[in-house]
Amino acid sequence: MKWPIGYVALDSVMEGWAPERAIGVLADLGFQAIDWSFVQFDRLDQSPTAFRDLVSRTRDAGLQVPQLVMADDLITLDAHLWTQRVNHLIRAVDAAAEAGVPSVGVSTGPHGWDRTALQVGIDISETQAWDLAVAGLTQVVEHADSSGVRIGLESVWGSLARSGERTQRMLDSVPDLGITFDPSHFVLTGDDIPQWAHVWKDRIVHVHLKDGFGVQDSEDFFFPLLGEGRVPWQQLLTTLADDGYDGYASIEAESYALLSQCFDNDPTEPARLSLQLANRLYALAGV
């Protein structure tokens, strides 16, 4: 099964492009989908109709939109801010439902790249952090259940649900929560990536094609081109195929040193190369 390949429009350059430019470039390269994000749709200032129009323009160019990507940090001691962030996610669900987008991507927080984020165990207790994340995601998932939109938790590095075991704990706490399966983050925690994909076969709503190398607690981890990291691609792809995954797989490009040093911060050629590598990995895995 060859899953349609999309592109997460959230790299350091393309996120600053006008959507029409991203649509044109990705369509010309041969991508089949785009994951739009909170960058292209501001759920504070825009109505769900604005996102529906963006999705319509995307589909007019022959591309689908499998996911709306959000990144609201649910780990905060500010009760007003926490409520605001949960409501942001609920508005994103409403926008996805109106546009016919099947999933919304979320993470728990705290975000490791944000120096202002709380540090669990220092600024906030582990118990408090889990209670906030579970309560917030429960509200969002319950709201989404009535709309047909699935919520896909991404196990982002540094976040509360950053490893296989911690993600499973969150899934146990929020039974209808799905997974946006990004294998790169499980490289950093040393998890058995194909095994977790199999365990979550009924919870995976979307897949990211992204490689990783290094250890989470080190400053030296990075996300290289597909095939250059430690993701066991053949095992992972055959596991997904054998377990019947039938959604989209979106490339998430974060090879920022390569982008800067070799391509003058133009993501077009790295995107083209990533698409070629993804198709090669598909072929080698026989999917």
Give names to the regions the model predicted.
Residues 1-6, 11-30, 138, 146, ...:
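Histidine-acidic metal/acid-base catalytic patches
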Residues 1-10, 66-76, 112-120:
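N-terminal small/glycine-rich loop or linker at the start of catalytic domains
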Residues 18-21, 57-60, 78-178, 188, ...:
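Active-site acidic/histidine proton-transfer and metal-coordination neighborhood
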Residues 32-33, 64, 102, 150, ...:
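Residue-level detector of anion-binding/catalytic polar loops
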Residues 35, 67-69, 105, 152, ...:
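Conserved beta-strand positions in the central sheet of alpha/beta enzyme cores
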